[in-house]
Amino acid sequence: MKKKLKTFSLILLTGSLLVACGRGEVSSHSATLWEQIVYAFAKSIQWLSFNHSIGLGIILFTLIIRAIMMPLYNMQMKSSQKMQEIQPRLKELQKKYPGKDPDNRLKLNDEMQSMYKAEGVNPYASVLPLLIQLPVLWALFQALTRVSFLKVGTFLSLELSQPDPYYILPVLAALFTFLSTWLTNKAAVEKNIALTLMTYVMPFIILVTSFNFASGVVLYWTVSNAFQVFQILLLNNPYKIIKVREEAVRVAHEKEQRVKRAKRKASKKRK
């Protein structure tokens, strides 16, 4: 069942990206439904471009889209956080039922499902919000790269159709990417090489690729990642999560100590 769900999720994700991978010019005469969605996004950005400032339109529309998707993001992050919290216990179960013996695999799956139910965790709850978000964000990205009237104009003296010659936007995009990834991983129960690599590799990739992208696209990346930093600090603040976790450990330790003291007193009375 687990493998089927993973495969289904992968198919949905791949399908979304394949549908959105066209590169040709998009206009009001474009034939496909996807291109009409992309064009609708572009017209919305144009409508928000007060004083014909496409850069301002990109910023406002990106903020609106990210704000609308905040509940989905919050659902995704809370589910991921719950999964992180029970990871140590899941590893203990995997040690208890090692190997690929069918009986062990069945017992492992049963105990994992019982744990998920007891903790109110759905291991796939973080996948569905992501699958909904990706096509929306990809449509916004394609609106900036495939619709002609969004490729022109300036923003703070930057030509939106050209790479930023001062490298200000690429640096900001990389910085906010780093901050969002670092904050997301800071509260992880268990750190691993993959998380560490993601924290540093993703900003580097964004930085390098931004040197050659049009400033309008990099402006979108910058605003989107800056908003994500705001979302994390507002809804899933890692410092608060760590504080709550440490408090829970402290309370559990004090309870354990009280139980031990009570047992010692009871033992002395019996003597």
From Swiss-Prot:
GO MF annotation terms: membrane insertase activity
Q: Enumerate the Gene Ontology biological process terms.
A: protein insertion into membrane; protein transport
Tell me which residues bear the S-diacylglycerol cysteine lipid modification: 21
Lipid linkage positions (N-palmitoyl cysteine) = 21
Signal peptide positions (record): 1-20
* Protein family: Belongs to the OXA1/ALB3/YidC family. Type 2 subfamily.
Regions crossing the membrane:
45-65, 124-144, 163-183, 201-221
What does the UniProt entry say about where the protein is found?
Cell membrane
The organism that produces this protein has a lineage beginning with: Bacteria, Bacillati, Bacillota, Bacilli, Lactobacillales
- The protein, known as: Membrane protein insertase YidC 1
Q: Which organism is it from?
A: Streptococcus agalactiae serotype V (strain ATCC BAA-611 / 2603 V/R)
Could you state one GO cellular component term attached to this entry? Answer: plasma membrane
